[in-house]
């Protein structure tokens, strides 16, 4: 029998291709879809960046707090989430870093709608980071590490920019880039959502795969 595979990103597909020699007609890429959890971005009015994730080592919160020391004092970081590093985060709150703990999604997305960008500093491979997709769904740009699927999503969507976790200068450059080109990244993020991540478009992608598999494609 013929086995086919569906991957969430081109990055996943490329990793699989290196492990198994398989006909390209048996391999497909279809990301998860997301629904909008807030109004499309109203545009960034100030230098506010959002971290919204579990407070764990692999999510890069320690890395982010260390890198934030390199930025000007008027670059504000809002941290949402809970986890084993909660006490560590609380101890590192400064005048330009605010910690809100576990917060309802509605409040987080209201903040995202006027933020400069979501910051996603994960230091491990992720499956399909839904917060990236949800941020882009409302036109909020993303600054992410260039690791695995997260980096792949940013490269393909052009809805933000990436940095190398072990090179602080690339983080500073990424933050400045998203500030200077915010409107462009907002537009790209919304376009990527409409063309790839929306429920309707995702249905079309899924249906095309089924047509290919069962319709003699």
Can you say where each PLM-predicted feature lies in the sequence?
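Conserved donor-binding/catalytic core segment of Leloir-type glycosyltransferases
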Residues: 6, 32-34, 41-59, 65-69, ...
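Nucleotide-activated donor-binding/catalytic signature segment of Leloir-type glycosyltransferases, i.e.
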Residues: 88-106
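Short hydrophobic beta-strand element within catalytic cores of glycosyltransferases
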Residues: 132, 141-144
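Conserved acidic donor-binding segment of nucleotide-sugar-dependent glycosyltransferases
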Residues: 101, 156-168, 177-183
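Short alpha-helical segment that forms part of, or immediately flanks, the ligand-binding pocket
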Residues: 109, 132-137, 151-152
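A charged, aromatic-enriched C-terminal amphipathic alpha-helix characteristic of glycosyltransferases
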Residues: 183-214
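Acidic donor-binding loop of glycosyltransferase active sites
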Residues: 113-127, 140
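Donor nucleotide-sugar binding/catalytic pocket of nucleotide-sugar-dependent glycosyltransferases
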Residues: 1-39
């Amino acid at each position: 029998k013929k086995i086919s595979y569906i991957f969430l990103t081109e990055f996943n597909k490329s990793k699989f291709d290196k492990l198994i020699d398989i006909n390209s007609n048996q391999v497909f890429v279809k990301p998860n879809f997301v629904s909008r959890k807030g109004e499309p971005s109203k545009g960034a009015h100030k230098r506010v960046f959002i971290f919204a994730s579990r407070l764990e080592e692999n999510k890069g919160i320690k890395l982010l707090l260390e890198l934030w020391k390199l930025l000007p004092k008027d670059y504000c970081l809002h941290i949402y989430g809970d986890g084993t590093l909660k006490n560590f985060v609380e101890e590192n709150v400064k005048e330009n870093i605010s910690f809100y703990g576990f917060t309802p999604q509605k409040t987080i997305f209201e903040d995202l709608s006027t933020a400069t960008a979501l910051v996603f500093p994960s230091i491990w491979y992720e499956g399909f980071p839904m917060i990236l997709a949800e941020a882009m769904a409302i036109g909020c740009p993303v600054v992410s590490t260039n690791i695995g699927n997260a980096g792949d999503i940013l490269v393909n969507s052009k809805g933000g920019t990436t940095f190398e976790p072990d090179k602080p200068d690339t983080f500073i450059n990424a933050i400045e880039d998203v500030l200077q080109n915010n409107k462009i990244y907002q537009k790209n993020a919304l376009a990527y959502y409409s063309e790839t991540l929306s429920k309707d478009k995702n249905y079309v992608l899924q249906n095309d795969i089924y047509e290919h598999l069962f319709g003699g494609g």
